[in-house]
Amino acid sequence: MATKLVESEIENKLEALNALITDDTPWERSGDSIKKTFTFKSFIRAFGWMSQMAIWAEKLKHHPEWFNVYNKVEVTLTTHDAGGLTELDFSLAEKMEKFK
């Protein structure tokens, strides 16, 4: 089971994650999760990205909560088993940023 991060680790990892963004939309903390809305040029690009991320999520054995409408994908990451944010959440978020 993944270990829940302490507050200082979360702050440092969130800052490092937001240094990777290529758009103007940062990841935001929301309680025991991090969230971001990704915007794409079309539905097919949004869905294609989700398909790629699903493969990475399966490899990490860590799955996002996400919602797609047309060209937008809202992502929420948390580790339910740990009761909060873990390294898995930030690893998956980093993959999402790199493949956007």
From Swiss-Prot:
Transmembrane segments: none annotated. Keywords: Lyase. Pfam families: Pterin_4a. It catalyses: (4aS,6R)-4a-hydroxy-L-erythro-5,6,7,8-tetrahydrobiopterin = (6R)-L-erythro-6,7-dihydrobiopterin + H2O. GO terms for molecular function: 4-alpha-hydroxytetrahydrobiopterin dehydratase activity. Its EC number is 4.2.1.96. InterPro entries: PCD_sf (IPR036428), Pterin_deHydtase (IPR001533). One of its GO terms (biological process) is tetrahydrobiopterin biosynthetic process. It comes from the Bacteria. Signal peptide: none annotated. Belongs to the pterin-4-alpha-carbinolamine dehydratase family. This is Putative pterin-4-alpha-carbinolamine dehydratase. It comes from Alteromonas mediterranea (strain DSM 17117 / CIP 110805 / LMG 28347 / Deep ecotype).
